[in-house]
Amino acid sequence: MIDPVNNFKIPEDWIARTGLPREELETKVASGMLVVLSDGSILKRGYTTGTTASAAAKAAVLSLKKTVDNVSVPTPVGLRARLEVSEASQGRAVVKKIQNDHESDITRGLDFVGEAREAEGIRVLGGKGIGIVRRDGLQVPKGQPAINPKPMEQIKAAVQEAVEELSLRGAEVTISIPDGERIGKETLNSRIGVEGGISVLGSTGFVEPWNDHLGETRGDLIRCTDKVVLTTGRIGMRYSHMLFPDYTIVMIGSRISEGLDYASGDVVICGLPGLVLKWGNPDMLKDGEYATVVEMLEKDPEHPRLKEAFEMAIEKGKGARIVVIDRDGSVLMDSKNES
């Protein structure tokens, strides 16, 4: 049985410990909404802001010509997500971001509003409650709504489905989050240069229910291998499979030190600079000259703090190989090449 969101093969003893009929468990796991832990307990994933926005956008378009109470939208990992629609009429729809077991997901329960009109082609706009990018170095250009590229693709794909279903020429959809500006103040957005609301994010379409129990699950996986790559996210995971094909790849997010505690043998830490270098030196951005590590890399690639943070990461790695990659998979830094 394989978790379709992270491609993790769930061990048979974990499956047995759930106590659920195999067919029932397989159906639920296949939906992407459940995570099975090593002790047999089950946690619920949620849908990202990107998936919720996609549902609101699609429902808004469909409501131009029909009644809508739920919608199915594509996700970046290839699964379908079905969400309830709170309101939908005359080109306006509301979808609530569902609950999940991620204890610190402050966007749970937020209303996402889509407002649509027929137009030429597909166009998605950011409305009230979606932050605006005010600094360079992020995935979204300065001055644009903070809708990351992957969820933007997802939203446009969902709108395209609705356009085809209704045989429209195209559609323009504005996404807004009425409570987004207030919630945005509780996030790190202002520190990285996003103002006025939250960001629309999500590389998989699903919110992982990260907590201490999942730390144990990953700990079990790390312990079981003597050749492991600890990676910080899905981009790192994708390219780690290519760079280290005979290693076990484990996604640990920002918990690099915790992952190292479980690891032995041949260990690699591989990921984007924002997490790996800041793990090496958490204070590398303290003077406020740059908002993000990416901005520092782009504007001053020879900045001494980059090398300093990398050297500190090597020291903290206690013999692990440290590999820092770019978003296209190119290797920026590799401790194997250090003299």
Curated annotation (Swiss-Prot):
Instruction: Give the catalytic activity.
Output: Co-precorrin-5B + S-adenosyl-L-methionine = Co-precorrin-6A + S-adenosyl-L-homocysteine
Q: What is its EC number?
A: 2.1.1.195
Keywords from the UniProt entry: Cobalamin biosynthesis, Methyltransferase, S-adenosyl-L-methionine, Transferase
InterPro entries, A to Z: CbiD (IPR002748), CbiD_sf (IPR036074)
EC main class here is: transferase
Give the pathway listed in the UniProt entry for this protein. Cofactor biosynthesis; adenosylcobalamin biosynthesis; cob(II)yrinate a,c-diamide from sirohydrochlorin (anaerobic route): step 6/10
* A Pfam family per the record: CbiD
Show which residues constitute the signal peptide: none
Could you name the domain of life of the organism this protein comes from? Archaea
List, in alphabetical order, the Gene Ontology terms for molecular function in this entry: cobalt-precorrin-5B C1-methyltransferase activity
A GO term (biological process) for this protein?
A: methylation
Q: Does the keyword Transferase apply?
A: yes
SUPFAM superfamilies registered for this protein in UniProt: CbiD-like (SSF111342)
Q: Which family does it belong to?
A: Belongs to the CbiD family.
Protein name, please?
Cobalt-precorrin-5B C(1)-methyltransferase
Q: Which organism is it from?
A: Methanosarcina barkeri (strain Fusaro / DSM 804)
Q: What is the lineage of its organism?
A: Archaea, Methanobacteriati, Methanobacteriota, Stenosarchaea group, Methanomicrobia
Encoding gene per record: cbiD
